[in-house]
């Protein structure tokens, strides 16, 4: 997403929590594409730090026009193993910071008489539910609801939209072969790629008449009615072959 935006004329602030080398490499790639770029380290689960992030970026860049909320924690649980502790970690990583950053963008663009856009990265699983990754899914469901409510409450200065990817990158304990099988378990026989997601994010940022809605970019995975997380289904299919 950062590279796509940088390649289409956007300057890019790259946030990271602990992956400094990866963030610096991404920033360098953005700079090579002609973008002004800088990295910013913040633990978004800390409310004070999350609230300080956007003003810090504004101080460095002069203004912010869009926020892409892609930071996410991804820990496994299910209805039998649910705990307050994990749910709180998921909420503090996946939901609350996105709301705080939308607030901050609204304050910043309103102060200068401008407009802005927030894009929240969600999950096709919200439209294709199963009991795996319960707390993660609940945190993303809350963010999807917040996307609509923020769009209503922050208009007309800020538009708020969502993008719901499918199987896009290796995650958790998924092996390469499982990822390839999972990626094909959609009506289109392909799920989303990073490039697909980046184009969708940029489309929303550049579309001034769109707010309060989510684009599902998943090869139709949300139509498949899968009873388990696709990682487990791909593993099961491999065992049956």
Predicted feature descriptions by range:
Residues 5, 63-64, 144, 154-168, ...:
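Conserved Rossmann-fold SDR core element
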Residues 51, 73-89, 107, 111-112, ...:
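Conserved mid-core segment of classical short-chain dehydrogenase/reductases
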Residues 73, 80-99, 119, 136-143, ...:
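Catalytic Tyr-X3-Lys loop
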Residues 1-13:
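Canonical Rossmann dinucleotide-binding motif of NAD(H)/NADP(H)-dependent dehydrogenases/reductases
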Residues 194-217, 222-223:
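C-terminal substrate-recognition "lid" of short-chain dehydrogenase/reductases
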Residues 55, 89, 93-113, 151-156, ...:
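Amphipathic alpha-helical dimer-interface segment in Rossmann-like NAD(P)H-dependent oxidoreductases
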Residues 73, 110-155, 167-168:
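Catalytic loop of short-chain dehydrogenase/reductase
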Residues 20, 41-53, 81-84, 195-196:
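The beta1-alpha1 cofactor-binding region of Rossmann-like NAD(H)/NADP(H)-dependent oxidoreductases
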């Amino acid at each position: 997403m950062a590279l796509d935006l940088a390649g289409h004329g956007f300057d890019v602030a790259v946030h990271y929590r602990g992956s400094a080398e990866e963030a610096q490499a991404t920033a360098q790639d953005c700079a090579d594409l002609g973008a002004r770029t800088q990295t910013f380290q913040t633990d978004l689960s800390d409310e004070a730090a999350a609230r300080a992030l956007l003003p810090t970026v504004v101080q460095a860049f002069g203004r912010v026009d869009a926020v892409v909320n892609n930071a996410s924690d991804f820990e496994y649980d299910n209805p039998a193993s649910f705990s307050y502790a994990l749910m709180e970690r998921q909420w503090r990583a996946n939901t609350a910071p996105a709301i705080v950053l939308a607030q901050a963008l609204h304050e910043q663009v309103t102060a200068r008489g401008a407009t802005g856009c927030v894009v929240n990265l969600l999950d096709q699983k919200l439209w294709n539910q199963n009991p795996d990754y319960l707390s993660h899914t609940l945190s993303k469901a809350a963010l999807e609801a917040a996307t609509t409510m923020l769009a209503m409450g922050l208009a007309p200065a800020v538009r708020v939209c969502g993008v719901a990817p499918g199987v896009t990158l290796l995650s958790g304990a998924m092996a390469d072969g499982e990822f390839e099988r999972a990626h094909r378990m959609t009506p289109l026989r392909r799920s989303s790629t990073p490039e697909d997601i980046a184009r969708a994010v940029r489309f929303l940022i550049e579309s001034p008449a769109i707010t309060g809605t989510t684009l599902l970019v998943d090869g139709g995975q949300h139509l498949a009615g899968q009873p388990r997380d696709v990682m487990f289904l791909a593993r099961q299919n491999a065992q049956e072959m």
